[in-house]
């Protein structure tokens, strides 16, 4: 973490010797890469009282006294983003961004009652999102001339398409039932983000974009269907399970104004 902070200050400090932004630039394009950390994403039944098909977790307490579910998160992952936007006022810009998070590894623990020992859970997911964003530059709003640094605050709304492969539940403490694999699932839902960052001029047209961003990508779900079990190859029918997907991330982008 200290190394990342030092590198960020080096980037910001080096901007003192770089050109300022072009006053005439209105439109811009930007490509970014992000390093993100998932919030807790615990899977539960969509309806824990469902009977047709039955809920996977149900309503009884788990082995640790909590509601039965899969407790975990999607860990650390990378994202790619492409954006096109424009300044609608000297201090206000808007853009349309497309973000792809190609590989998110879910890892957690289940707590089914009566199962001894650990109950690891694994899955792989991905997400595509499209958002309309708005950014306010407070220094320009306050009447200061644009310099090499343009701090901003922003937010966006849009849609996210989230997909997850079948979730694998392992039961190493059981003698017969060792593994269950749920159906995969996909869902398109509303998404939003909030961000704070700064633009850094590399020339009158080229700029860096460094930002912190919180993103909520809505729900991830496994669909109702047949769950595989090693001791019952035909499996059993289960209802939908779901969680929310949110992340904290650092975004580094390179843009061009024209």
Protein language model regions, located:
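Short loop/turn motifs that connect adjacent beta-strands in outer-membrane beta-barrel proteins
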Residues: 21-26, 91, 139-150, 202-205
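Transmembrane beta-strand segments of Gram-negative outer membrane beta-barrel proteins
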Residues: 23-39, 151-153, 247
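Hydrophobic, lipid-facing positions within transmembrane beta-strands of outer-membrane proteins
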Residues: 78-82, 128-132, 151, 190-196, ...
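Residue-level signature of outer-membrane beta-barrel architecture
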Residues: 35, 86, 98, 136-138, ...
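Extracellular/periplasm-exposed beta-strand and loop segments of Gram-negative cell-envelope proteins
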Residues: 38-75, 99-130, 159-189, 217-230, ...
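Transmembrane beta-barrel strands of outer-membrane/channel proteins
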Residues: 31-37, 96-100, 153-159, 198, ...
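Cleavable N-terminal export/targeting peptides
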Residues: 1-26
């Amino acid at each position: 973490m200290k190394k990342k902070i030092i590198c960020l200050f080096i980037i910001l400090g080096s901007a003192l010797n770089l050109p300022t932004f072009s006053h005439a630039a209105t439109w811009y394009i930007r490509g970014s890469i992000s390093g993100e950390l998932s919030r807790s994403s615990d899977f539960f039944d969509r309806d824990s009282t469902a009977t047709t098909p039955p809920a996977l977790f149900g309503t009884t307490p788990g082995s640790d006294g909590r509601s039965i579910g899969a407790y975990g998160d999607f860990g650390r992952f990378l994202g790619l983003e492409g954006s096109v936007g424009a300044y609608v006022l000297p201090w206000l810009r808007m853009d349309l961004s497309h973000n792809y998070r190609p590989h998110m590894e879910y890892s957690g623990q289940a707590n089914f009652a009566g199962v001894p020992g650990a109950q690891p859970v694994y899955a792989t997911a991905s997400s595509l999102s499209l958002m309309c964003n708005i950014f306010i530059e407070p220094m320009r709003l306050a009447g200061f001339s644009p310099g090499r640094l343009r701090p901003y605050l922003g937010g966006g709304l849009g849609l996210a398409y989230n997909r997850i492969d079948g979730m694998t539940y392992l039961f190493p403490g059981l003698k017969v039932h060792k593994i269950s694999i749920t159906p995969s699932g996909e869902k398109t839902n509303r998404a939003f983000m909030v961000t704070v960052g700064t633009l850094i001029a590399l020339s009158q047209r080229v700029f860096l974009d460094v930002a912190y961003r919180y993103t909520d990508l809505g729900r991830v779900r496994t669909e109702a269907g047949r769950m595989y079990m090693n001791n019952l190859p035909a499996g059993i029918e289960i209802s939908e399970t779901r969680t929310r997907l949110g992340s904290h991330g650092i975004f580094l982008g390179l843009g061009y104004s024209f």
